[in-house]
Amino acid sequence: CIVTTIRFFAILSMDYYILGGIIMLDFSSEVFYRGECFYAYKYFGAHITDGGVMFRVYAPAARRVELIGEFNGWNGENSAMKNDGRGFYELFVPNACEGQMYKYRVYQANGRIVDKADPYAFASELRPGTASIIASLDKFKFTDSKWINSRTKLYDEPFNIYEIHFGSWKMPNGGITEESKPDELWYNYSEIADELIAYVKEHHFTHIEILPLAEHPFDGSWGYQAAGYFSATSRYGKPQDLMEFINKCHNNGIGVIIDFAFVHFVRDDYAMGMFDGTPLYEYPPSDVNQSEWGSYNFNLSKGEVQSFLMSSAAFWLDIYHFDGIRMDAISNAIYWMGNKDRGINDRALDFVRKMNWNLDNTFRNVILIAEDSTDFPNVTRPVEKGGLGFDYKWDLGWMNDTLEYFKLDPFLRQYHHNKINWSMAYFYNERYLLPLSHDEVVHGKATIVNKMWGLYGEKFSQARSLYTYTVSYTHLRAHETDQYLV
């Protein structure tokens, strides 16, 4: 494996892989364990080859791993995977084919036997099922090369983002009901493309930001507790449907950003938690093992976890042609448990810098956005200049102060102008993006209109003033608006 070193970071050279394809010629376990592998999904997972499918999984402490699936009647007795001595198990199955479901039966170090979904699966069974699915990702042919080659980071151009949750932007048959069949609950990725693109263009948005699409078990969530970091949720269709959606967006001049939750993951038994009977992806049992949301915290100090997450971020940009990544809960990576009093998580910060540097230097003008509620400095400063390497940071302070201001009686606002002008005291410290996001309309917080002062009819004029103020804020041209706001 050829490695190019930039200060204390490393990026795998691009000629080491079959780019544009999905199968890796060779693989360096040393690079993987160092946390410098950027394309682990080209090695692990289920890969269709001539005559069958090659399966590989990382489970170093497992006593035995069996491959079970539709191709062997879910009986793994004669399908034990080979341990190659590096912590990797593999098995070639000549009769396996695309579309078949599978799992790994892991004989764990703690004595349990658990059927696990593939952490590197490219597709997943529609919930409530939890199996992985053999999928080919090279069938769809993108026609967006002109867009990809001309996109920029929009530092000096209009940047107006429309944030959506794919499952609730518009739902057929009035939405989710107990009588609905599982495959009738949502529109397909490609089905909704034309209508959504027309809406976005009509309202002069430049980008669509989609709440997390990584496979997740709970319909009622937005997808922030993921189980499949290389698997676009099957709720809205197959991988090719999502590719078609993004391709249509690009050919209509619309960029697409994905929300990426890399700090924590779902605790469900079929997923990555205690994968081989040890805390393989998460921190060992301690006060940092679980997040404030009840999920497992990724152990961002482990090289193999870093390789997993870097590869996931690269996967969405490489395979699906996303134009940017909005990284969730950065404060929980900067500080232990997101608590400034507990100190800085240096290993996690080093990982964030490494991931951002690699993404920025591999994918042409990809946009990296931090959802960060702290005052930690240099979030949007380049890595080579000592920063974290993000292009934009959500200005959550501006959002909170501005919404508080617009709740006030107009007569009383003269005593609270500090809520409007305070953000200018730190405005030039970072490259900020002004968010009016989903976080502000949930858990009884009310819509934007209902946050405004006045009787119901008066609230709409206040909301118009808010949006006008937002888009005219100093010279900044980066804004983010959510589907739920009005």
Show where each model-derived region lies:
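Conserved alpha/beta catalytic core and glycan-binding cleft of carbohydrate-active enzymes
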Residues: H321-D323, Y335-E480
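Short proline/glycine-enriched turn/loop motifs at strand-loop junctions of beta-rich domains
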Residues: Y58-R64
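Hydrophobic alpha-helical segments, chiefly the membrane-spanning helices
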Residues: L485-V486
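Short, Lys/Arg-enriched N-terminal segments with co-localized hydrophobic residues
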Residues: C1-I2, R7-I23
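Beta-strand signatures of extracellular beta-sandwich domains
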Residues: E66-I68
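The feature marks proteins involved in alpha-glucan
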Residues: I23-M54, N83-E163, S168-E184, E191
